[in-house]
Structures are given as C-alpha cells and as structure tokens.
Amino acid sequence: MARIAGIDLPREKRVEVGLTYIFGIGTSSAKKILKETGVNPDIRIKDLSEEEVNLLRDYINQNLKVEGDLRRDVALDIKRLKEIGSYRGIRHRRGLPVRGQKTKTNARTRKGPKKLVVSRKKK
C-alpha cells in the first residue's frame, strides 16, 4: 500500500485518481504531478514501484502544501477573518454562507436543520 503525505492510497485505483484522496490535490494537480514526475497516470497504485512512490512523495513534499499544513493554514485564515471583523469573518462566525449566496430559502447546509417555531393557541 502506497502511503503519501500520511494517507494510505487505495490500491485498486489509478494513480491519477488515487492522488486526489490527499487533501489539497485535485484532478488537475494530480495530472500535473504525474506529468512532472513522468509516472504513467493509467497505472494502478498497487503496480507502482517503490522508486515511483518515492518520486511522487518527494515531489509532493517539496512543491505542494497538503493535508495538515493546508488544513492549519485554512483554519488560521478563517480565524484571522473573524478577528479583524471583516464581512466574511462575520459570516463565518454566524455560520452563514460566505460567498454571497441567498439565504431566504436555501443555505440549509450552513445554517443546519430548520428550527421550528411553535405558536401557542390563544385562549
């Protein structure tokens, strides 16, 4: 099993797809990595030689910010936005959409489940 950036990559997947299991690497980044290192993107992860795995691992460690480092940087960026009181920071603090989406009817993912308002019966 290939282990890159602390992640066990799935053995049966193609290398191009397997690299996307690492936080911070998408499909375009995976294609670029494979092109730069010269590894065949159609080969399965289980068929990679130890030399190719080390080549990928070294390239990712030297050139990309992935997993823990990237998560920490994103968290610090959000914390900074909250501290300076920017509009985006306020939206993060309130748990609302940050990028200008409408919130009258949608935004259930950010806002969470509906809070039911129970009206009392008048006597």
From Swiss-Prot:
One of its GO terms (cellular component) is small ribosomal subunit. Keywords: Ribonucleoprotein, Ribosomal protein, RNA-binding, rRNA-binding, tRNA-binding. One of its GO terms (biological process) is translation. GO terms for molecular function: rRNA binding; structural constituent of ribosome; tRNA binding. Gene3D superfamilies: 1.10.8.50, 30s ribosomal protein s13, domain 2. Residues 92-123 are annotated as: Disordered. It comes from the Bacteria. Located at the top of the head of the 30S subunit, it contacts several helices of the 16S rRNA. In the 70S ribosome it contacts the 23S rRNA (bridge B1a) and protein L5 of the 50S subunit (bridge B1b), connecting the 2 subunits; these bridges are implicated in subunit movement. Contacts the tRNAs in the A and P-sites. Part of the 30S ribosomal subunit. Forms a loose heterodimer with protein S19. Forms two bridges to the 50S subunit in the 70S ribosome. NCBIfam families: uS13_bact. Belongs to the universal ribosomal protein uS13 family. This is Small ribosomal subunit protein uS13.
